[in-house]
Amino acid sequence: MQPSHQSVIKVEQLSKTYGKGENAVMAIKACSFEIFKGETVALLGPSGSGKTTLITMIGCITEPTQGKLYLDGELIFDQHWRISDTRKLRRQKIGFIFQSHNLIPFLNVEENITLVPLMNKTNPKEATLKAKELLDYLGVGNKLTAMPSQLSGGQSQRVAIARSLANNPKIILADEPTAALDGERALSVMQLLKKLATEQDVAILVVTHDERMIPLFDRIIRVNDGFVTEDIQQMS
């Protein structure tokens, strides 16, 4: 399945400034791009280039200073207005994968995966069934009752991926998801994310500095000094 032309994320002249007056620092500078359903996009750039700031704005964690941000065709921020309940929006439409997995240590795998769906008022039986299906799909179906401390690094990341899919998101935002993994495991996780975009029809935006992963993405967006310097569509 090829990426569609259905817009999931659209940013228009998005900027972020920290501080005021002489101490103001502009971390993101008038960035514009669009991400579509079923598309895998890499956000590349050196440390301090603005990648994390950009992804936290897209994830409705950090509020932009200027510009417009659309999610699934809905305007959720401009400099004069923003959607009131960003937490609910995150729970319903965005999945997150972090470098450190961020699994809750005192909850087992099933409880970690079903937490957000249950917050969204999903039927508990349906949430558990979805968790089982995702774990089977990701090759860790026997870990449903395991505690995070009992998982290997690769297993933890697969559970984190399952958790990101549990609320049927429109987009998954992944911040350096393979940084803690060795080369072979990192490649395996990235191939899995590519497969998910196609088979689950979800957009995936990955912050990474690993140039070896570039061939796996549909598009490469490069950021440097707060600017989008390149937006390249790759040949499939």
Task: List each language-model region with its residue ranges.
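ABC-family P-loop ATPase nucleotide-binding domain
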Residues: 1-17, 230-236
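Conserved switch/coupling elements of ABC/ABC-like ATPase nucleotide-binding domains
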Residues: 75, 225-233
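ABC family nucleotide-binding domain
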Residues: 8-9, 14-223
